[in-house]
Amino acid sequence: MTSIAHLRKSYERAELSEDASHADPLQQFEKWLKEAISAEIPEPNAMTVATVASNLRPSTRVVLIKGYDERGITWFTNYDSRKGQELAGNPYAALQFHWVELERVVRIEGIVEKVSEEESDSYFHSRPLDSRIGAWASPQSQVISGRSVLVANAAKYGAKFLLNPPRPPHWGGYRLKPDHWQFWQGRKSRLHDRLRYTLIEPASTLPDAKPVWIRERLAP
């Protein structure tokens, strides 16, 4: 075995206390995300998405969050991809943000559903032209003979659609509806701060109703 055990650092940038954290995990997430953006961390919107196949084999990939609100965390992708196929069979997933420079991790778990056709259309048409063509050109997660396949497909669909490609039927958005959040702040001596939020009562249909969360500290 090649040892890399010497690669270690002491986490001493900040702390995470119950008093200083929000009772609502979405507000705490928004606070940390804004701080990551302000710190000019490369791609602070990058998150790992973990799904599980029917044979119980997990898989992960990095995608970019495109929005969040009280309904959940939203991203867009190819529905025919491996993650799309796995979500079709098992709609539960986990997300993770790792902001290394701030010594922070956010973990989110919940059930995933597709966003509306209108929401997918709206985001798709806001993308750069080459990205919209790319959504047609790439048979995501399928084996191809070489990069030339992608180049040829991009040329074909670029010529076909010119400046106005429609959204492919196999492409759109997902939204994870959180029922579990964890916030991790690195601390000295590996005595890290971990706060877990568990949903105990979803928001009702009454106006201005808010979900009820229980917040607990976990040992690191």
Curated annotation (Swiss-Prot):
Catalytic activity: pyridoxamine 5'-phosphate + O2 + H2O = pyridoxal 5'-phosphate + H2O2 + NH4(+); pyridoxine 5'-phosphate + O2 = pyridoxal 5'-phosphate + H2O2
Biological process terms in GO annotation: pyridoxine biosynthetic process
Pathway: Cofactor metabolism; pyridoxal 5'-phosphate salvage; pyridoxal 5'-phosphate from pyridoxamine 5'-phosphate: step 1/1; Cofactor metabolism; pyridoxal 5'-phosphate salvage; pyridoxal 5'-phosphate from pyridoxine 5'-phosphate: step 1/1
Assembly and binders: Homodimer.
Family note: Belongs to the pyridoxamine 5'-phosphate oxidase family.
Residues the entry annotates as binding substrate: 8-11, 66, 123, 127, 131, 190-192
Keyword entries, A-Z: Flavoprotein, FMN, Oxidoreductase, Pyridoxine biosynthesis
Protein's UniProt name: Pyridoxine/pyridoxamine 5'-phosphate oxidase
NCBIfam families with a match to the protein in the record: pdxH (TIGR00558), PRK05679.1 (NF004231)
Binding site for FMN: 61-66, 76-77, 82-83, 140-141, 184, 194
Record's cofactor remark: Binds 1 FMN per subunit.
InterPro entries in alphabetical order: Pyridox_Oxase, Pyridox_Oxase_N, Pyridoxamine_oxidase_dimer_C, Split_barrel_FMN-bd
Keyword Glycoprotein belongs to the record: no
Species of provenance: Albidiferax ferrireducens (strain ATCC BAA-621 / DSM 15236 / T118) (Rhodoferax ferrireducens)
Chain's role: Catalyzes the oxidation of either pyridoxine 5'-phosphate (PNP) or pyridoxamine 5'-phosphate (PMP) into pyridoxal 5'-phosphate (PLP).
Requisite cofactors: FMN
EC number: 1.4.3.5
MF (Gene Ontology): FMN binding; pyridoxamine phosphate oxidase activity
Domain of life: Bacteria
Keyword Plastid appears in the UniProt entry: no
Top EC class of this enzyme: oxidoreductase
